[in-house]
Amino acid sequence: VAAVPAPEGQEWSEIAEMTDRNGYLVGNPDAPIHMIEYGSLTCPGCAAFSQQAIEPLMKDYVDTGKVSFEFRSFAIHGPIDLALTRLIDCGSPSQAVPLAEQIWATLPTLPQPVQQRSQQLDAALALPEDQRFVAFAETAGLLDFFAARGISRDQARTCLADAKRLSEIAEYSESYGTQDDIRGTPTFIINGTQLDGGSWESVEAALQRAGAR
């Protein structure tokens, strides 16, 4: 498979768009090798994969133009996953995967306010639907986290008040289980074939078998 140069002045890993399955596709949209990760933003296995994989995946594969990487946020852990998915969705498509990477990098500390404030979070989720996720994210400390990473508090509140978009995210996420038959996270698919392993070593080997090297 031949390399494809990126548009002048850019790397393929800086270019992203939304897909028709509510994924964030990074790289050459016409790349011959298409890799999908179904991941949860609060999944320790997804965080471990991210720490191993993201640098070589982007530099050695996506930037060649041979491989595109699509992340589909599978919100299997309820309101916290839905809120985080809406927040990575709040900026431009090119911000979504880097924001997901930063969530995974801080995952050991991120759920602490969620565990400590369960009563307040339950109260937030009982509010009208255009208020509940704003209150949930404020209580969980998520607005501070994203404000430090380029999504302002006002921008985040506006996104989290959009009940229609949150409902869309939940429906797409449900379809990953019912329609795509995804049973856990992380799950990887390369050119339509689901991989058995979840390690970077097994994913990289599959990319190479597909012609990425």
Per-segment meaning from a language model:
Residues 1-81, 173-174, 212-213:
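Extracytoplasmic thiol/disulfide redox context detector
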Residues 16, 90, 159:
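Functionally engaged cysteine thiol sites
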